[in-house]
């Protein structure tokens, strides 16, 4: 969301990792539930700082980190960089969740295999297609994909 990011919040915190770290530390001290962080690769291709950022978040107490494999300036264009997610996973002790370009069962399997992530976050692929979760679950278990509901059921869901 441009209004949020441009005011220094959301993905805008990638530009001020020290502030993001202070937020994680404060939240961690204030709550008794796990504290998670979601970030992108960086603000733009000239400021990719996800490795330093996620290390700092982990050091400040984050219990899990989700990485969207694009920069803020990419928004949802281009291809998610699963290699960078793999690098984050390699350096983190906390669970890492991969996000970006997971659109169906086969892409979910490829993403987990490539990144070594502990889990997946599916975003835009769910818009108008909540059955994608059934497809992904089947693919991850190596099972056949169940048929989609009949058109009438899909229309009712919409």
Predicted regions and their residues:
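Alpha/beta catalytic cores of nucleotide-metabolism and tRNA/nucleoside-modifying enzymes
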Residues: 22-25, 30-32, 46-64, 83-98, ...
């Amino acid at each position: 969301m441009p209004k949020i990011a441009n005011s220094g919040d959301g993905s805008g915190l990638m530009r001020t990792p020290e502030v993001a770290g202070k937020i994680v530390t404060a939240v961690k001290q204030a709550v008794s539930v796990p504290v998670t962080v979601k970030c992108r690769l960086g603000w733009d291709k000239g400021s990719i700082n996800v490795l330093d950022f996620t290390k700092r978040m982990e050091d400040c107490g984050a219990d899990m980190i989700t990485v969207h494999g694009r920069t803020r300036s990419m928004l949802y264009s281009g291809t998610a960089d699963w290699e960078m997610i793999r690098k984050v996973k390699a350096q983190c002790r906390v669970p890492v969740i991969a996000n970006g370009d997971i659109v169906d069962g086969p892409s979910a399997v490829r993403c987990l295999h490539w990144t070594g992530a502990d889990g997946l976050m599916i975003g835009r692929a769910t818009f108008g297609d909540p059955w994608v979760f059934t497809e992904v679950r089947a693919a991850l278990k190596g099972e056949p994909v169940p048929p989609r509901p009949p058109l009438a059921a899909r229309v009712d869901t919409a």
